[in-house]
Amino acid sequence: MGYRSDLVIVHSFMHKSHAREILTAFTLDKRCQEYDLTRHLKISCDETHTADGKRDVYSLVFVGEQWKWYEDSALGAYEDVKCINSMLDLCKDFNKERGIPYAYKFLRIGEEDGDVERREDSSQCKHGEFLEDYQESSAYIHTTIEQDFRNLKSVSEGLTELQEKENVNE
């Protein structure tokens, strides 16, 4: 059993080659293969409009449902979680060493009411800020209320129907 969370983690880049390099470095981690983490990883190429014209944004997106997301516990973080989180470290390293801009967004919703977590980071440059703005409109938490009552009627219709049933039973 254990506590489970739904999550979306996004790493966005200005160029396809940058996304490819990060993905390649990530998949070299033995934990990525051991836990088959690429199964939860999606790739997005989205054309977005800017003041300068059109730009492509390339994103690596983890989508996890009902995940045992333990970053810190008495026994330490889960290895799959550590591996997924290591992609942000790769982005930071590639930015520091090679100037590759990135933006990062982490969204998690836990089982309990109000257990919502958001984290963001970027390369803190013009392109990083652009990517952050892009992510802001592309990944967000939206809460809804769902109901599954059947045969809902207005109060007047319901009262009329109840009255008719009472008259039949008399």
Q: Where do the model's predicted regions map?
A:
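Intrinsically disordered, low-complexity, mixed-charge
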Residues: 30-31
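Charged interaction segments
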Residues: 26-27, 36-170
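Short, extreme N-terminal segment that most often corresponds to the first beta-strand
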Residues: 1-27
